[in-house]
C-alpha cells in the first residue's frame, strides 16, 4: 500500500482524533510531535516513522517487536505491552483501525463518490452493472473511468487485480479509495459485506449511495453472525454512513430497511412489481441479446437490455439503475450502460458445439441464490434436463447445507454434490448433510463425488441430453480451502469447457 501525498500529521493529532470518537483509554504522558510517516496493522509493512496498530485475536507480541525493530515510532492497542515505545491504549481496536486508516489516507471518501451495495446475493453483479453505467457516463462526459472494489476483482485507477475479500480491512480499503481519488476517478463502486460493516472495515467511509438489495438467511454461525438479527442489523449499518439510500421494495423486512434508510437525505426505491417504487420494471421479456426490461424511472421510461439469460438479474440491474438515479447520471448513460457488461464467475455460459448441453458457471453459494437461479433456469429451459453441481463450505454458514439441499431437491433433475471450501471439516460429512436435505424433497437422483473436477465430469457425462449443466459456488476462484489451508484449484469454467469438449455427443 502506498503512502498518501497530503501533509503528515503528528502522533498527538492522531490521538486527538481518536479521543473525538471516545476511543482512548490511556495515552503517552509526554507530548509527541513526531510526524507519522506511515500507518499499518501489518508488521511486514512497517518502515521508519510508522504508527503500528495491534489488531486481531491472533496478535502476538513478536509482531510488535518486529515493528519496533523496523522503525515503528508508536503503537495503538487494546493491550498495554511491556515494550519501550509510546503506547495509545484504546477501547475498540476495530473502530480505531477505521479512524487511523481514514486519517492516514486523508479521508479519501470525501474526494470520491463511493457507492456501496450490501445484500445476501447479487452484490458483485450490482457492482459491475453500476460500474458499466458509470463507465458509459464517463465516456459521454470525458471524465475518468470509475473505480471498483468487489469480491471478484478491484481496479482503483492505479492498481488492479483479483480480490481476496469481499470487503477488505480498513487500511487496504482506504488505500484503494485514495488511489481512486489520486487517479481522478469521480466514483468508486464497492461491495459492503455484513462482516465488513459489522467489524468496521467500512468505518469512517462516507458513502454517497448505500444500497440494500435483499436479505436471506446466510452467514449464520458462531464465527460469523450468531443470529439472523445480528446479520440483518449489521447490514442496516450501511445507512448510518450514506448520503443517499437505495432500497428494494420486494425484499423481506422492507419496513425496517426503509426506517433505517430514513436518516439519509433521499431514498430511491426499486421493484419488480411494486407500483410505489421510483424505479420499476413494467415488463420483462427474453430478447436476442439478453433480457429486455421496460423500466420506469422518475425521469424516463425506456427498454433496457441486460446481458443475462435469466430474469432474476433484472432486480440487480434495477438496483444499479436506482443508484445511478440517486447520483444524477444521464438517461443515455444509464440506458446504454449495461451493454457489454461481463461479470466474471457469474452466469458464465459455455454452450457445447453440438448445442445439446448448455454449461453455466455461477457463484450461487447459499440457498436463496441457488433457488432463484434454478427456478429461473427451469422456467427458461423447460424442455432440458437441469443438472447442478455444488457443495457447501465447512466451518461456517452451516445452514447452507440445508437451504441449498432443499433448493436443489426442489428444482434440479440431476444433482452432483461435491466439495466447496470444506476447510476444517470432512467433505464427506458436509456432502452427506446436503444429501439428506435433497432427499427430504423427494428427489433421489443425486450422488456424492467429492473431487470437484470429477463431479463436473460426472454431471456432463451422465446428464440426459438436451440439458443445462450448472456448476455453482466457486465462480472465478482458483483456490480451495481445505484442512491444511488454501490449495490451488482449477477454475470451474476451465473444467467445464474442457469437459464439454470431451463429452459433447
Predicted regions and their residues:
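Short, well-ordered alpha-helix to beta-strand connector turns
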Residues: 36, 48-49, 72, 84-85, ...
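ATP-dependent carboxylate-amine ligase
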Residues: 1-23, 48-51, 57-59, 115, ...
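Short, ordered loop/turn segments at secondary-structure junctions
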Residues: 79-81, 151-152, 215, 272, ...
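Short loop/edge segments at beta-strand edges and connector loops
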Residues: 77, 91, 150, 192, ...
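Acidic, Mg2+-coordinating active-site environments of NTP-dependent enzymes
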Residues: 81-84, 181-183, 198, 208-359, ...
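N-terminal leader/targeting and accessory segments in enzymes
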Residues: 1-99, 103, 280-282, 309, ...
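Phosphate-binding loop of NTP-binding sites
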Residues: 97-249, 253-266, 381
Amino acid at each position: 500500500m502506498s503512502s498518501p501525498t497530503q501533509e503528515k500529521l503528528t502522533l498527538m493529532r492522531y490521538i486527538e482524533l481518536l479521543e473525538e470518537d471516545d476511543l482512548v483509554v490511556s495515552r503517552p504522558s509526554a507530548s509527541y510531535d513526531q510526524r507519522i510517516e506511515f500507518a499499518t496493522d501489518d508488521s511486514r509493512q512497517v518502515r521508519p516513522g510508522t504508527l503500528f496498530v495491534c489488531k486481531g485475536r491472533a496478535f502476538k507480541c513478536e509482531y510488535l517487536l518486529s515493528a519496533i525493530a523496523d522503525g515503528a515510532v508508536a503503537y495503538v492497542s487494546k493491550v498495554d505491552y511491556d515494550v519501550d515505545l509510546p503506547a495509545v491504549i484504546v477501547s475498540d481496536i476495530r473502530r480505531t483501525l477505521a479512524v487511523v486508516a481514514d486519517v492516514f489516507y486523508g479521508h479519501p471518501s470525501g474526494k470520491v463518490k463511493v457507492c456501496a451495495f450490501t445484500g445476501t446475493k447479487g452484490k458483485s453483479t450490482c457492482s459491475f452493472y453500476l460500474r458499466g453505467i458509470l463507465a458509459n457516463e464517463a465516456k459521454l462526459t470525458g471524465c475518468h473511468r470509475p473505480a471498483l472494489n468487489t469480491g471478484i476483482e478491484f481496479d482503483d485507477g492505479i492498481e488492479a487485480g483479483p480480490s481476496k475479500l469481499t470487503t477488505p480491512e480498513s487500511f487496504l480499503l482506504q488505500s484503494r479509495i485514495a488511489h481512486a481519488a489520486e487517479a481522478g476517478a469521480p466514483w468508486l463502486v464497492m461491495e459492503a459485506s455484513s462482516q465488513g460493516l459489522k467489524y468496521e472495515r467500512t468505518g469512517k467511509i462516507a458513502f454517497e449511495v448505500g444500497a440494500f438489495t435483499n436479505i436471506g438467511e446466510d452467514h449464520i454461525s458462531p464465527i460469523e453472525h450468531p443470529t439472523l438479527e445480528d446479520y440483518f442489523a449489521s447490514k442496516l449499518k450501511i445507512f448510518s454512513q450514506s448520503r443517499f439510500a437505495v432500497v428494494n421494495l420486494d425484499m423481506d423486512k422492507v419496513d425496517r430497511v426503509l426506517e433505517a434508510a430514513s436518516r439519509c437525505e433521499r431514498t430511491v426505491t426499486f421493484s419488480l412489481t411494486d407500483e410505489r417504487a421510483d424505479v420499476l420494471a413494467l415488463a420483462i421479456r427474453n430478447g436476442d441479446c439478453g433480457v429486455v426490461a421496460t423500466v420506469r424511472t422518475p425521469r424516463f421510461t425506456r427498454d433496457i437490455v441486460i446481458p443475462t439469460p435469466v430474469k432474476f438479474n433484472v432486480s440487480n440491474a434495477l438496483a444499479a439503475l436506482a443508484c445511478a438515479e440517486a447520483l444524477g447520471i444521464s438517461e443515455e448513460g444509464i440506458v446504454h450502460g449495461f451493454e457489454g457488461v461481463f461479470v466474471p464467475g457469474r452466469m458464465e455460459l459455455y454452450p457445447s458445439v453440438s448445442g445439446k448441453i448448455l454449461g453455466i458457471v455461477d457463484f450461487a453459494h447459499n440457498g436463496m441464490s441457488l433457488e432463484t437461479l434454478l427456478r429461473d433456469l427451469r422456467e427458461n429451459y423447460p424442455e432440458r434436463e437441469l443438472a447442478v453441481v455444488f457443495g457447501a463450505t465447512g466451518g461456517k454458514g452451516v445452514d447452507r447445507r440445508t437451504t441449498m439441499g432443499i433448493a436443489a431437491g426442489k428444482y434440479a433433475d440431476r444433482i452432483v454434490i461435491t466439495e466447496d471450501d470444506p476447510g476444517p471439516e470432512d467433505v464427506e460429512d458436509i456432502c452427506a448433510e446436503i444429501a439428506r436435505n435433497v432427499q427430504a424433497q423427494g428427489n433421489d437422483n443425486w450422488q456424492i463425488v467429492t473431487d470437484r473436477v470429477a463431479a463436473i465430469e460426472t454431471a456432463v457425462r451422465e446428464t440426459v441430453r438436451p440439458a443445462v449443466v450448472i456448476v455453482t459456488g466457486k465462480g472465478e476462484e482458483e483456490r480451495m480451502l481445505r484442512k491444511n489451508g488454501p490449495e490451488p484449484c482449477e477454475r470451474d469454467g476451465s473444467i467445464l469447457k474442457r469437459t464439454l469438449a470431451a463429452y459433447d455427443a
